[in-house]
C-alpha cells in the first residue's frame, strides 16, 4: 500500500464516527510498520478514546519504529481523555503523518511541537484537502462558537417545495427520505419554524433504529406552539428548544412548556422577531455545534439574510408542480438584481434513488474571492 492509501484508510475509519463524535471532530488513525498495518482506530464517540489511542489499543505487535497516519493533528492536552501525543511518544512511534491542522487553541500546532521535541518526525498537511472535508462542522464551531448551519429542502424540478394548497408529502422518493434521516443523525440540532409545526405537526426526530435524534429547535416569535403538538408532548424524550421574541402574554405559556420539558430562549431583535445571530450564539454556548435547517421558505429567507447558513443541500425530484401560488424554498421579498444573489459553490451532485441531491457551500464575503476562483 502507498502513503496515500494508508491515509485514505484513516479517512474511511474516521467516517465511522459520523454523528457520534460531536462536538469533537471525526478522526481516524492507521499505524504501519514494515509495510503492513499493525493497528488502526477511530474516535467512536464523544468522551471516549481518541483515534490514536484506539489504534494503539489494537496493535498486533510493538509500534516501536512505526509510522502513524492520522487525519487530524494529535491532541496534547488533558480533556475527557489523556493527550494522544503522550501515547505516541510512549509507544516509540518514529513518524507521524498528519492530514488536517487542529484550530482548537488548546492544540493549534502544540501537538506537532511536542512530538518534534520528543524526537518524532512529523509530516504536516498530507492529503490535507481530503482530511479537511471530514470536519467542516468542527472547524467552524471551534473557531466561531456558533453552529454550522445546513439548509436542507426537497423541491420539484420547477422549484416548488409544496403545491398551491400547501401539500408536500411526498416530493422525493424513499431513498432520499432515508438520506434525510441520516442527515438528522449527523447534525446535533434540527431547526424549523412555527409555520411548519402548525401545518404538519412533525416530530423532527430520527426514525431509524441505532441512529440518534437531534436537539429540536423551533423558531416561534409569538410563542404559538400548541402544548398538544407532537414536539412538545415528546420533549421529555427528545431535547427540545423553542426560541421566541415577543413576551406579551407568554408567562403562563412558558411555565407550561417548561413543565413539559421544553427549554425556551428569548432572543428578540428590534422588530420583535427572532434575532437568528443571537440565537446561534446562545445555541453554541449550549454545546450545539451544527444545525440542519428544515424550515419553510420564510425561515430559510430569514436565515440567509442573517448570514447564518454555511451550506445548502437541495433534493430535486423529477416532478413539476407549476403555478405561481406554489411554495418555493426561499421566499421573502427576494433580491432586485442578479448581482445581489446569495452566491453558492457546488461541492457535490449525486443521484439518490430517483432524485438528485445538490450540495453547495455558501460563499460569504470572506470566501467570495476563493469561491469565484474555484468555480
Question: What are these model-derived regions, one by one?
Answer:
Residues 19-21, 112, 126-154:
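Proteins enriched for Cys/Gly/acidic motifs involved in redox and nucleic-acid/cofactor modification
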Residues 26-35, 153-154, 358:
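Short beta-strand scaffold segments in enzyme catalytic cores
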Residues 3-17, 22-24, 63, 80, ...:
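Enzymes that bind and transform nitrogen-containing heteroaromatic metabolites
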Residues 10-14, 29, 34-41, 130-143, ...:
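A short, flexible N-terminal coil/short beta segment enriched in small residues
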Residues 8, 12-15, 39, 50-53, ...:
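A broad detector of short, well-ordered amphipathic alpha-helices
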Residues 31-130, 215, 241, 246-248, ...:
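Zn2+-dependent cytidine deaminase-like catalytic core
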Residues 25-27, 127-130, 295:
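Short, conserved alpha-helical segments within structured domains
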Amino acid at each position: 500500500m502507498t502513503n496515500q492509501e494508508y491515509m485514505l484508510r484513516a479517512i474511511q475509519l474516521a467516517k465511522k464516527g459520523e454523528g457520534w463524535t460531536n462536538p469533537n471532530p471525526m478522526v481516524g488513525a492507521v499505524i504501519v510498520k514494515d509495510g503492513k498495518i499493525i493497528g488502526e482506530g477511530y474516535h467512536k464517540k464523544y468522551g471516549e478514546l481518541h483515534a490514536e489511542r484506539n489504534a494503539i489499543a489494537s496493535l498486533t505487535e510493538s509500534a516501536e519504529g512505526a509510522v502513524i497516519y492520522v487525519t487530524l493533528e494529535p491532541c496534547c492536552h488533558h480533556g475527557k481523555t489523556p493527550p494522544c501525543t503522550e501515547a505516541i511518544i510512549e509507544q516509540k512511534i518514529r513518524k507521524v503523518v498528519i492530514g488536517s491542522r487542529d484550530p482548537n487553541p488548546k492544540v493549534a500546532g502544540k501537538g506537532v511541537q511536542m512530538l518534534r521535541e520528543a524526537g518524532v518526525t512529523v509530516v504536516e498537511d498530507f492529503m490535507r484537502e481530503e482530511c479537511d472535508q471530514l470536519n467542516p462542522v468542527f472547524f467552524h464551531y471551534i473557531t466561531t462558537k456558533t453552529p454550522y448551519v445546513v439548509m436542507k429542502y426537497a423541491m420539484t424540478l420547477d422549484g416548488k417545495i409544496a403545491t398551491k394548497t400547501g401539500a408536500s408529502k411526498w416530493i422525493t422518493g424513499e431513498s432520499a427520505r432515508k438520506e434525510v434521516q441520516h442527515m438528522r443523525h449527523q447534525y446535533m440540532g434540527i431547526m424549523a419554524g412555527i409555520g411548519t409545526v402548525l401545518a404538519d405537526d412533525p416530530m423532527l426526530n430520527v426514525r431509524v433504529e441505532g441512529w440518534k435524534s437531534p436537539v429540536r429547535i423551533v423558531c416561534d416569535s409569538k410563542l404559538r406552539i400548541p402544548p398538544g403538538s407532537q414536539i412538545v408532548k415528546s420533549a421529555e424524550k427528545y431535547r427540545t428548544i423553542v426560541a421566541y421574541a415577543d413576551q406579551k402574554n407568554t408567562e403562563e405559556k412558558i411555565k407550561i412548556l417548561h413543565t413539559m420539558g421544553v427549554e425556551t430562549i428569548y432572543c428578540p431583535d428590534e422588530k420583535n422577531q427572532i434575532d437568528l445571530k443571537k440565537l446561534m450564539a446562545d445555541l453554541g454556548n449550549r454545546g450545539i455545534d451544527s444545525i440542519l435547517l428544515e424550515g419553510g421558505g420564510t425561515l430559510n429567507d430569514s436565515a440567509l439574510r442573517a448570514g447564518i447558513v454555511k451550506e445548502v443541500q437541495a433534493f430535486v425530484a423529477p416532478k413539476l408542480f407549476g403555478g405561481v401560488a406554489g411554495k418555493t424554498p426561499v421566499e421573502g421579498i427576494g433580491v432586485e438584481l442578479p448581482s445581489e444573489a446569495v452566491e453558492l459553490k457546488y461541492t457535490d451532485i449525486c443521484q439518490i434513488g430517483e432524485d438528485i441531491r445538490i450540495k453547495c457551500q455558501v460563499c460569504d464575503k470572506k470566501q467570495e474571492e476563493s469561491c469565484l476562483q474555484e468555480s
